[in-house]
């Protein structure tokens, strides 16, 4: 994968740079940002352009608006950027309209213009070339620092790159870091290499499991997806979530792991309840004792001990997907315990974005991880071995 870094660009004072960021941050009901990690991760690239005395234009989406909708405005992001960078952020009232153009014309070196939510324009998600061309007029240089949307062929990620030659487009520091940890480690991990795969559905992680199997030495399968595997082994799992149409696939994965000499671990006990409810009664049972009308909602203490032993001597860990319904405290213990055990490991620890990143934050072990991806869907597609359109568009030789 041959991709230009922002450091390879010949940036001169006064040059304009359009940076595609990923400011898709969670907001509470009052429009306050509840987690600004994605904004903070974009700062090194923005600061690099400031140090080079460039005129900076930032573009991002937020949520999935259908046309203009004030609650998806990037104004809270402008406010947070102002706090973090300690400088004024010029906020455009539109994306490629009169206000954005007028403000861009007046932009001075060292100033930052933030465009309004890119998805207010229907052309963004359609990868529309006309819209991409309008966006490209906001920068002599184009930098993609939005790993979280690089798996989508959208106008600000893919089509826009057609308007820049090889010397005028590059990856920002965050995108390069994501590629380094997720892509390069998969290619050449320090062994023993373990993958921890959780979450609710096998269907969502099937591609990743198939791609990881030939690469890993150990594999932990947890979360609700474990029940499809237990059923494939002939066990009854009560009312737990099972994808019956994937039982054959689960059998294939179990056989392939055996043939490849991969040590595969499944939970041996669960926290079960009659329904998914914070007030439901719970009990701990082994995997052979799940009552007919109850469902497993977290892994039990014997499973966390087993997984802790499995972590012994491992040198590289990739984790994607929680072990239970960690959003509800009584079903979060297994995931949090495992997060603590992973934190104590001396291995290189890479966390896929999305739910797993939220879990690591809830467990309070963010600083103990080597790298936490900012993209849930994008990191999963890399684990599946797929090419991401936004990264492919930056490869030297791509037109």
Curated annotation (Swiss-Prot):
Tree of life domain: Bacteria
Uppermost EC category: transferase
Quaternary structure and interacting proteins, as annotated: Monomer.
Keywords carried by this UniProt record: ATP-binding, Cytoplasm, Glycolysis, Kinase, Nucleotide-binding, Transferase
CC per GO annotation: cytosol
The family this protein is said to belong to: Belongs to the phosphoglycerate kinase family.
Coiled coil: none
GO molecular function: ADP binding; ATP binding; phosphoglycerate kinase activity
PANTHER family (UniProt xref): PHOSPHOGLYCERATE KINASE (PTHR11406), PHOSPHOGLYCERATE KINASE 1, CHLOROPLASTIC-RELATED (PTHR11406:SF23)
UniProt keyword annotation of Cytoplasm present: yes
Annotated catalysed reactions: (2R)-3-phosphoglycerate + ATP = (2R)-3-phospho-glyceroyl phosphate + ADP
Name of this protein: Phosphoglycerate kinase
Pfam families: PGK
BP terms from Gene Ontology: gluconeogenesis; glycolytic process
UniProt-listed InterPro entries: Phosphoglycerate_kinase, Phosphoglycerate_kinase_N, Phosphoglycerate_kinase_sf
Gene source species: Nitratiruptor sp. (strain SB155-2)
Chain residues that bind ATP: 205, 296, 327, 353-356
Cellular compartments annotated: Cytoplasm
Broad class of the protein's primary localization: cytoplasm
HAMAP family, per the entry: Phosphoglyc_kinase
């Amino acid at each position: 994968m041959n991709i230009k870094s922002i450091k390879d660009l010949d940036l001169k004072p006064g040059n304009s740079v359009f940076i595609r960021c990923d400011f898709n941050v969670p907001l509470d009901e009052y429009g306050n940002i509840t987690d600004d990690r994605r904004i903070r991760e974009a700062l090194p690239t923005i600061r690099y352009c400031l140090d080079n005395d460039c005129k900076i234009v930032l573009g991002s989406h937020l949520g999935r608006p259908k046309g203009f909708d004030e609650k998806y405005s990037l104004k809270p992001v402008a406010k947070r950027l102002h706090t973090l960078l300690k400088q004024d952020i010029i906020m455009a009232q539109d994306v490629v309209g009169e206000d954005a153009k007028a403000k861009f014309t007046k932009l001075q070196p060292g100033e930052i213009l933030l465009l309004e939510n890119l998805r207010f324009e229907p052309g963004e998600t359609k990868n529309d070339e006309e819209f991409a061309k309008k966006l490209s007029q906001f920068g002599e240089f184009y930098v993609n620092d939005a790993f979280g949307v690089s798996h989508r062929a959208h106008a600000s990620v893919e089509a826009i790159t057609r308007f820049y030659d090889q010397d005028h487009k590059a990856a920002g520091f965050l995108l390069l870091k994501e590629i380094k940890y997720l892509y390069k480690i998969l290619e050449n991990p320090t062994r023993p290499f373990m993958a921890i795969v959780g979450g609710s559905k096998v269907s969502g992680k099937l591609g990743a499991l198939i791609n990881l199997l030939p690469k890993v030495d150990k594999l932990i399968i947890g979360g609700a997806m474990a029940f499809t595997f237990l059923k494939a082994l002939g066990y009854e799992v009560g009312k737990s979530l099972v994808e019956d149409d994937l039982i054959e696939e689960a059998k294939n994965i179990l056989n392939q792991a055996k043939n490849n000499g991969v040590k595969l671990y499944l939970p041996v006990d669960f926290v079960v309840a009659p329904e998914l409810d914070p007030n439901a009664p719970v009990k701990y049972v082994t995997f052979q004792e799940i009552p007919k009308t109850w469902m497993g909602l977290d892994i039990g203490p014997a499973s966390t001990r087993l997984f802790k032993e499995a972590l012994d001597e491992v040198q590289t860990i990739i984790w994607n997907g929680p072990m239970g319904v960690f959003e509800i405290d009584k079903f979060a213990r297994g995931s949090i315990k495992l997060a603590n055990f992973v934190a104590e490991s001396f291995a290189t620890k890479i966390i896929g974005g999305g739910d797993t990143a939220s879990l690591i934050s809830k467990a309070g072990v963010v600083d103990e991880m080597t790298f936490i991806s900012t993209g849930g869907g994008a990191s999963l597609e890399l684990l599946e071995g797929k090419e991401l359109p936004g990264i492919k568009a930056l490869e030297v030789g791509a037109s």
